[in-house]
């Protein structure tokens, strides 16, 4: 999401440098990144994440998986709205048009904050999957019960929930995904709730200590800790900067020891 500019969900955010955003995407593929997360509502003044992806990477590499999201989203004025089940097809078609594709690899259903049952919305996406517009389905911001509800309707390949070093309330969902062979895709793995809102509290001493042991940044340790939680975890840290991208990718090579993990877990 950082591709489109600063304060991406704010109406007064600054658009990104188009050339740099395209360079980030192309460098990601060069580094072996084969999973990109996007959405039609990822935009800022003058910039659309889907359009940038289409320009930078089309025609797409055969092994590249592009995952998008539908459900509550923003209109062209930046206002947020819910979506009825019958409106999801329009959102899917918008993503298809912006990405320049005839199908979507993975579509996640975003759950509305006050939504208890996702059956009707997920069922609508399952119909679009049967129609060939979508290859695989996922869900986002769900509980274990809601995941179970979705699985009764159609296969689920991934769950995208908030999760990270200081944001661990979705541990039960992660474990449920691991048991079922479903990818768990955390967002805010680096940022966390405070950093995402723009605040920068001091990093915990244990995290800095582990970073020092590995000659890594605190952000890299946050990302490495998240990846160490389970083999089914896939990370989607956002960036609009090539150097930051390379730092994030390097974090995947960090191997935290049992002592490292114990120290970090004690800091929760």
Short names for language-model regions:
Residues 1-12, 67-80, 103, 108:
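N-terminal small/glycine-rich loop or linker at the start of catalytic domains
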Residues 1-64, 191-193:
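N-terminal binding-site loop/beta-alpha segment at the start of enzyme catalytic domains
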Residues 12-20, 48, 52, 79-90, ...:
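Alpha-helix N-cap and loop-to-helix initiation/capping positions
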Residues 14-28, 82-99, 143-148:
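Short, acidic/polar
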Residues 29-30, 54-65, 96-100, 151-153, ...:
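Acidic (Asp/Glu)-rich catalytic clusters
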Residues 36, 104, 137:
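Glycine-centered flexible beta-alpha turn that most often forms the glycine-rich phosphate-binding loop
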Residues 96-114:
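Active-site groove signature of glycoside hydrolases
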Residues 112-268:
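Beta/alpha (TIM)-barrel catalytic core signal, keyed to glycine-rich beta->alpha loops juxtaposed to Asp/Glu
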């Amino acid at each position: 999401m950082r591709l489109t500019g600063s304060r991406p969900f704010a109406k007064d955010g600054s658009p990104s440098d188009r050339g740099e955003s395209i360079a980030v995407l192309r460098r990601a593929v060069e580094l072996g990144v084969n999973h990109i997360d996007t959405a039609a509502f990822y935009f800022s003044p003058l910039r659309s994440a889907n359009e940038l992806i289409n320009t930078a990477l089309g025609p797409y590499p055969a092994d590249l998986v592009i995952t998008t999201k539908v459900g509550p989203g923003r209109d062209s004025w930046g206002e947020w709205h819910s979506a009825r089940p019958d409106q999801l097809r329009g959102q899917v078609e918008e993503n298809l048009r912006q990405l320049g594709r005839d199908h979507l690899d993975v579509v996640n259903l975003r759950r509305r904050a006050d939504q208890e049952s996702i059956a009707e919305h997920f069922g609508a996406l399952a119909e679009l999957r049967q129609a060939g517009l979508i290859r695989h389905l996922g869900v986002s911001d769900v509980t274990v019960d809601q995941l179970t509800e979705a699985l009764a309707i159609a296969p689920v390949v991934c769950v995208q929930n908030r999760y990270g070093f200081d944001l661990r309330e979705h541990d039960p969902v992660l474990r449920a995904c691991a048991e079922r062979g479903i990818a768990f895709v955390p967002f805010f793995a680096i940022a966390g709730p405070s950093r995402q809102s723009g605040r920068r509290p001091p990093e915990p001493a244990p995290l800095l200590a582990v970073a020092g042991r590995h000659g890594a940044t605190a952000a890299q340790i946050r990302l490495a800790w998240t990846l160490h939680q389970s083999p089914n975890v896939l990370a989607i840290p956002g960036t609009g900067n090539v150097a930051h991208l390379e730092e994030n990718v390097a974090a995947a090579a960090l191997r935290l020891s049992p002592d490292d993990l114990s120290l970090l877990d004690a800091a929760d």
